[in-house]
From Swiss-Prot:
CDD domains assigned to the protein according to its UniProt record, in alphabetical order: CobB_N, GATase1_CobB
Source species: Halobacterium salinarum (strain ATCC 700922 / JCM 11081 / NRC-1) (Halobacterium halobium)
Summary of the function given for this chain in its UniProt record: Catalyzes the ATP-dependent amidation of the two carboxylate groups at positions a and c of cobyrinate, using either L-glutamine or ammonia as the nitrogen source.
Record's keyword terms, sorted: ATP-binding, Cobalamin biosynthesis, Glutamine amidotransferase, Ligase, Magnesium, Nucleotide-binding
Protein name as it appears in the record: Cobyrinate a,c-diamide synthase
Enzyme Commission identifier(s): 6.3.5.11
Length: 441
């Protein structure tokens, strides 16, 4: 749906948590299902840069989830991304606790979109204390100097009967009871490094989501939802007439829907699966998103696509790889078990998986010269989260100096060779990085 097509606006709410691990993802699925059952066309979204939680939204709602992050895309870009959604109500899953995060908290997302917050509170061992917690979160907005409307509570892991009644009765008039999510083992999502399993790998049981949705007050949530402000008009960039090959499989699954949309707006997009044995299609440029190449090293080592990619890159084909894409473009990738597999061999680095994450933050990069995604001196904002470390050759060339974050070696990001660029940073299309990439084809 284009901005003009959604001129009537899309109401929305933000599900903010009291802390990480409180059950926001499951609560989001329950609310989305309840609203859909009530006749609404639901657009899911995620506050922040995460790729994994949104993968659980689409199987339940049937619509790709939008990523809303003011650091990655700016306020106008975030509002534009929101209004490019497709539905009459948007359910935005928050990240971490409501006020947590120095540059892109859930509270900031809610404030800049002017959306009310439904506070997800773990009610497994409390009743009146749930109300006290919610009241504290409501009052803290003034202390944090952020304009956040905490509208009420969704009680996570709450039983019915006296438990639910006690929570509801304890809430002051300023806080609405929006229902509960019952404690059920089949609502748990298994996790691993980088977070939960992807929705395509470990989808939450659909009957369990239905059971949880039955206890959500969908009408109350729809009644408090409201429409964010619109950004200034934005003229789309012209079609390049070029073809971009995008890797799309379990090893390369971290791509924002907005990124795929921007690529399709300005180029012909062909997808391929290196893991499944697809060769690199005929194309004018390649995008390798992040994902889990470390879980598919054998398949990638045998993939004809990586051999072809190495040869085409050496001939000057523009190639952009982010995080997992960077790893696949390296000389080798070693798992935590010590197994080493050859990769495409385009970038002068050997990558090894670590037991602990090596970087997790929003980042800011400054281009030290003209590169695929930015002109010399330009800055890009992104996000990094990875468990791998790259050992680079002494003559390796970097495209970016790190102003915030860790990058590849603490000071630099963006290994570059030929017309290939590999970064640990993930960027959003509103950063202009993908437009620069397309213009370079």
């Amino acid at each position: 749906m284009t901005e003009s097509e959604s001129a009537s606006g899309m109401d929305g709410v933000v599900l903010g948590g009291t802390a990480s691990g409180v059950g926001k993802t499951v609560a989001t699925l329950a609310v989305a299902r309840a609203l859909a059952d009530a006749g609404h066309d639901v657009q899911p979204a995620k506050a922040g840069p995460d790729f994994i939680d949104p993968s659980h939204h689409e199987p339940v709602v049937g619509t790709p989830s939008r990523s809303l992050d003011p650091w990655l895309s700016g306020t106008d870009g975030m509002r534009r991304t929101y209004h490019q959604g497709d539905g009459d109500v948007c359910v935005v899953e928050g990240m971490m606790g409501l006020y947590d995060g120095s540059v892109a908290s859930t509270a900031r997302v809610a404030s800049e979109l002017d959306l009310p917050v439904v506070l997800v509170v773990d009610a497994s061992a409390g009743m009146q204390s749930v109300a006290a917690t919610a009241l504290g979160f409501q009052a803290y907005a003034a202390e944090a100097s952020v304009d956040v409307d905490v509208a009420g509570v969704l009680a996570q892991r709450a039983h019915g009967g006296r438990h639910a009644d006690g929570i509801r009765d304890a809430l002051p008039d300023s806080l609405t009871y929006f229902g509960r999510v019952p404690p059920r083992d089949d609502l748990d999502v298994p996790d691993r490094h980088l977070g939960l399993h992807m929705g395509s790998e470990a989808a939450i049981d659909d009957d369990a989501v239905d059971a949880a949705a039955a206890h959500v007050a969908a009408k109350r949530i729809a009644d408090v939802a409201r429409t964010p402000p619109r950004p200034p008009a934005h003229d789309p960039a012209p079609d390049t007439g070029q073809t971009v090959a995008v890797a799309d499989d379990a090893a390369f699954c971290f791509a924002y829907p907005a990124t795929r949309e921007r690529l399709r707006e300005r180029a012909d997009v062909v997808t391929f699966s290196p893991v499944a044995g697809d060769d690199l299609p005929a194309c004018d440029g390649v995008y390798l998103p992040g994902g889990y190449p470390e879980l598919h090293t054998d398949a990638l080592a045998d993939a004809p696509a990586l051999d072809t990619l190495g040869a085409r890159a050496a001939d000057g084909l523009p190639v952009l790889g982010e995080c997992g894409g960077l790893m696949a473009l390296a000389e080798s990738l070693t798992t935590t078990d010590g197994d080493t597999a050859e990769m495409a061999g385009v970038l002068p680095a050997d990558v090894r998986m670590q037991d602990r994450y090596q970087a997790l933050d929003h980042v800011e990069l400054r281009a030290t010269g003209d590169t695929l995604t930015a002109g010399s001196g330009a800055t890009l904002r992104g996000h990094e989260f990875h468990y791998s470390a790259a050992t680079v050759a002494s003559d390796a060339r970097f495209a970016f100096a790190v102003e915030r974050g860790d990058g590849i070696d603490g000071d630099h990001d963006g290994l570059t060779e030929y017309r290939t660029l590999g970064t640990y940073a993930h960027v959003h299309p509103e950063s202009t990085a993908f437009d620069a990439f397309l213009d370079a084809l």
